[in-house]
Swiss-Prot record:
Main subcellular localisation: other
Biological source species: Homo sapiens
Subunit details: Component of the IFT complex B, at least composed of IFT20, IFT22, IFT25, IFT27, IFT46, IFT52, TRAF3IP1/IFT54, IFT57, IFT74, IFT80, IFT81, and IFT88. Interacts with IFT20. Interacts with IFT88. Interacts with IFT80, IFT-81, IFT74, IFT172, IFT70B and KIF17. Interacts with BLOC1S2. Interacts with RYBP. Interacts with HOMER1; the interaction possibly prevents the pro-apoptotic effects of IFT57. Interacts with HIP1. In normal conditions, it poorly interacts with HIP1, HIP1 being strongly associated with HTT.
Region annotation (pDED) ranges: 335-426
InterPro entries in the record: Intra-flagellar_transport_57
Location in or out of the cell: Cell projection, Cilium; Cytoplasm, Cytoskeleton, Cilium basal body
Keyword Coiled coil carried by entry: yes
Gene Ontology cellular component annotations, sorted alphabetically: axoneme; centrosome; ciliary basal body; ciliary base; ciliary tip; cilium; dendrite terminus; Golgi apparatus
Keyword hit for Cytoplasm: yes
Disease / disorder: Orofaciodigital syndrome 18: A form of orofaciodigital syndrome, a group of heterogeneous disorders characterized by malformations of the oral cavity, face and digits, and associated phenotypic abnormalities that lead to the delineation of various subtypes. OFD18 is an autosomal recessive form characterized by short stature, brachymesophalangy, pre- and postaxial polysyndactyly, and stocky femoral necks, as well as oral anomalies and dysmorphic facial features.
Superkingdom assignment: Eukaryota
Protein name: Intraflagellar transport protein 57 homolog
Domain notes per entry: The pseudo DED region (pDED) mediates the interaction with HIP1.
Family classification: Belongs to the IFT57 family.
Encoding gene per record: IFT57
Length: 429
């Protein structure tokens, strides 16, 4: 991993990097640099750029209905549960993007099993995972950024993405202004004209026989004309005008290139001479400062030894006092635990007492209240009235029953006397 993790080795040096020995073991631990804590921010920014190249906004965020994370989302702790879910889903998408089948994790899945599956896929790509799986359970940190960055690189390799060379901007220099547009020749035009002249010369060299015949005829004509007097037919004013017209076109401007190695070599020589001259002056001061620092460190070490020897008894007393303090703290913790238990029992007893008091108050209020007594009196009065009415009804019923019995008895006697006919009465008729 590119992040500055603590690596255990068996030697004091590996790849020219100094290492310090761990206390109590024979192993050697790689020292973390001062910028190791900020390396995960760089990895996270690279991860965001790689995800943009993989079009994760269209293919992952919109389909999963998720919010786009910030540039340092997995580097800083915000919401561990949300970050862990985002890490698992993004890792699964990157694994599928890299050509490996991987099921999308759900919220109810076991996090340990999910992390184990992700790490196994990471090792199958040939990447190292020399850290405990619990580092990924938080959902943020350098290990989370490392795992996602590895999956993003594998996905880019699978889709055949290649990084192109950077295109540096061309620095444009100010050119001299000329009245006419085409009054200036550049170095490219000069090269083109030079190439055209070379091609013309080659064509002339090919037709050597024709050239010899032409030169022979010209020599014959010149020998015939040498007998005449040579006179110039050129006008001086026209010649000067032609020179003034052609002169701007003959000007050649060569652009200076800032990337020319000659300029850099000169600058390097200048810087080297400046460094050597400055080193001669500062070397003496640096040597003097080094000697003073060495003497000061020796004095500090000797003073530390003297102070340790002088304060050894006080240090022992301090350690004994620390031990007594720890024992007192333990006893205090034990006593505090008993007090807490008794306080809990007291609170329970107080609750029961409050309940009893409340019940007593309710009963006392019910006893002192006259409303129930009034109700009882009213009920008794009503019962008495009902009893009188019932007695009257009973008397009426008894009287009616007695009358019915007397009437029945009289009817019976009447019937008995009506059925017996006296015999002497019949003889007189």
């Amino acid at each position: 991993m590119t992040a500055a993790l603590a690596v255990v080795t068996t030697s004091g040096l590996e790849d020219g990097v100094p290492r310090s020995r761990g206390e109590g073991t024979g192993e050697v631990v790689l020292e973390r640099g001062p910028g190791a804590a900020y390396h995960m921010f760089v990895v996270m920014e690279d991860l965001v750029e790689k995800l943009k190249l993989l079009r994760y906004e269209e293919e992952f965020l919109r389909k999963s209905n998720l919010k786009a994370p910030s540039r340092h989302y997995f580097a800083l702790p915000t919401n561990p549960g949300e970050q862990f879910y985002m890490f698992c889903t993004l890792a699964a998408w990157l694994i599928n993007k890299a050509g490996r089948p991987f099921e999308q994790p759900q919220e109810y899945d076991d996090p340990n099993a999910t992390i184990s599956n992700i790490l196994s896929e990471l090792r199958s790509f040939g990447r190292t995972a020399d850290f405990p799986p619990s580092k990924l359970k938080s959902g943020y940190g350098e290990h989370v950024c490392y795992v996602l960055d590895c999956f993003a690189e594998e996905a880019l390799k699978y889709i055949g993405f290649t990084w192109k060379r950077p295109i540096y901007p061309v620095e444009e220099l100010e050119e001299e202004s000329v009245a006419e547009d085409d009054a200036e020749l550049t170095l490219n035009k000069v090269d083109e004209e030079f190439v055209e002249e070379e091609t013309d010369n080659e064509e002339n060299f090919i037709d050597l026989n024709v050239l010899k015949a032409q030169t022979y005829h010209l020599d014959m004509n010149e020998t015939a004309k040498q007998e005449d007097i040579l006179e110039s037919t050129t006008d001086a004013a026209e010649w000067s005008l032609e020179v003034e017209r052609v002169l701007p076109q003959l000007k050649v401007t060569i652009r200076t290139d800032n990337k020319d190695w000659r300029i850099h070599v000169d600058q390097m020589h200048q810087h080297r001479s400046g460094i050597e001259s400055a080193l001669k002056e500062t070397k003496g001061f640096l040597d003097k400062l080094h000697n003073e620092i060495t003497r000061t460190l020796e004095k500090i070490s000797s003073r530390e030894k003297y102070i340790n020897n002088q304060l050894e008894n006080l240090v022992q007393e301090y350690r004994a006092a620390q031990a007594q303090l720890s024992e007192a703290k333990e006893r205090y913790q034990q006593g505090n635990g008993g007090v807490t238990e008794r306080t809990r029992l007291l609170s329970e007893v107080m609750e029961e007492l409050e309940k009893v008091k409340q019940e007593m108050e309710e009963k006392g209020s019910s006893m002192t209240d006259g409303a129930p007594l009034v109700k009882i009196k009213q009920s008794l009065t009503k019962l008495k009235q009902e009893t009188v009415e019932m007695d009257i009804r009973i008397g009426i019923v008894e009287h009616t029953l007695l009358q019915s019995k007397l009437k029945e008895k009289s009817n019976m006697t009447r019937n008995m006397h009506a059925t017996v006919i006296p015999e002497p009465a019949t003889g007189f008729y």
